[in-house]
Structure formats: structure tokens, C-alpha cells
Amino acid sequence: MLVSLTEEKTYKMLVEKMDAGESFIGEDILLEFTNYELLHGILTCSLPISLLFPAFLRKRKTELCYKLALAEAALDTDGEYLRKSSRISYLDSAEKSMISYYLGNFFTFLITRKLFDTEYLLHLNYMRDGQGNAYDSAGKKKRQELIGYQKEQDAWSIWEAKGRSNNMKEAMEKGCSQAGEIGNVNGKSPVLKAVCMTYYERGYLNAKIQKESRQGDIGLDFSKEAYIREYYRSIRELFLEYYNCENMRDLRLCGIDFVELLLPVPYFLEGQSLQETERCICIGMPRNFIEREESPFWIQEHLEELKKELGESSYLGRDGIYVRKALDKKNELFL
């Protein structure tokens, strides 16, 4: 069946976790997640290609629509499981590789939050070192892709996101080699270095995680404040594209001022909807995050209260960004 990530649904996915080294027997996990959790991962996954283009009207909405269209076009559902869609079978191998790369990133963002409590994940391309130089390359093999941060432990992690059609040992080995080159982030040893790869097994989408124990001699040095600012940059710009428009509303949750954006997006595939040409994604974040770029960590003290107030048809990340079932301005559900 067709995937529509704006429709409320719980999915399942087999994830294999492997420790460092080849002798470790993997631990299989049946990961459950909702469409809202996956939407949150797609929303917060800011890919480096966006840095190529200057700002233009509705740039961030265009990016989000593109990412959403790729995910929905590439995948079908079989009950609660996601599988490879025959729609992409005619594509050139390079085009398929590009789609696999995007899926690998989307699900790495989802999995690191679900299984490793990583609140923040950002591509290294967005960061600059203490001298203001971009991290175009940080090692012999290739630039390491993703830097994770956990506020409670004040800990950094290194992640390589891979997306493949098959379970490729070579891709995992290359990812481990890349991650292993990093010795420290801002003077601290990473608490975790790992590769997360999505692939298809008998047509079903699976994921594999392999940890890396090697300690390289490369150090990454950047401002934590700049890291957090860059993490929220694409979401802030999405909200600012619609600021003071009728698509936005103010609301107060647990005594905190939020701004909620009702973002219309098209149905991309024939058959996704028999009547409508458009649906909505409802995204919210604290007003202070948008207007003043202030440190967001205080929001974590209110997470449980906020989750109760938002209800079941939603997902609130530890980053303070939520996705929920679309509501109109009278607080009535869009159906």
C-alpha cells in the first residue's frame, strides 16, 4: 500500500545493533515508531546540499516537500512494515543511490533518538572550526557526517549515515573507518562512534548499527552555541517564511508560549487521496526559539507535561520541536 506520512500510523522496523569488531553477534531489535516520529526526523534532517542555494521564497518548505516526496515515493507499506516500492524500479542506479542516501539520513535521525537518546544531530558541514574554517574534510578517508549531542551528559557522538539497496559489509567498514578517525570533540572523547545503515532485506526496509572503538587523532573544535544555532536554523527559517501569516497561530502549552505552523503540502503520488489535492503538517516550537535564538535546554524540564497536553496524536522531541495531527484555527481536527 501507498505510504502517506501525514496519516496516523505505527510502523515496525528490524534494527540490528552490533558492537565494535566482527566477532560480536548482533542484537536484533523490533523498533516501533509513529508517522509523527518519522516526520520529526525528516523535518530536522538538514542536508548539506541546502548550503549551495541562497535563500528564496519558501525555500525551506520546498526542501521539506522534496524530502517528504522522496520518502513516500520510495516506500510502500505491508501491514506495519515498510518495504521498497516498485515505483522506483525504473530509475537509474545513481538516482536510486541518491534516494537510499536520503532514507539513510532520515532513519539515522529517527534511530539515534529512539535507541540512543540523542537529542541533537547535525551534519558537520554546517560547522566551522575556531578559526572560522569550514570542515570540508576532517580525515584521510572522508569527512565524518553527523555530530550528535546529549545535553544531560554534555556528551558528543559521531555518526555515519549510510543508505544502501543491500546489506553491504563494505559500506559498514568504510563508515567505521571514517568514524574511527575522530579522537575528540571540543576536547572530549565521543561517548559513541557508530554507523547506521538502512538497506532492504527481501524487500523490507531494515537498519544496522555498528559501533566503532578505534580512537583516531583528529579533534573537532567548534562552539556549542553555534552548533545548537545551526541545528535550529532550518526550522527557524521555515517558521519565518510564514511569520504573521494565517497559517500560524500562537498557543500556550504548560505556561510556555508556542508558535504552531499549519503547513500545507501536496499529495505527491497518484492514489494517495481520492478527493483532496493537499494535506497539512502541523509543526510547533517555543516562540523564544524563533525570535531570540536562545538556549533551548530549559524546555527539557517540561517535556512530560507538554507531551500530556499535546496528546497521543503527536510527537515532541527533546529539542522542543513537535509534530502533531493537523488542527485548524478553531482547534478542530483536519480530516
Language model features: what each stretch is:
Residues 109, 163-226:
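Catalytic cores of nucleic-acid endonucleases
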Residues 140-144:
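Short, surface-exposed coil-to-beta transition loops
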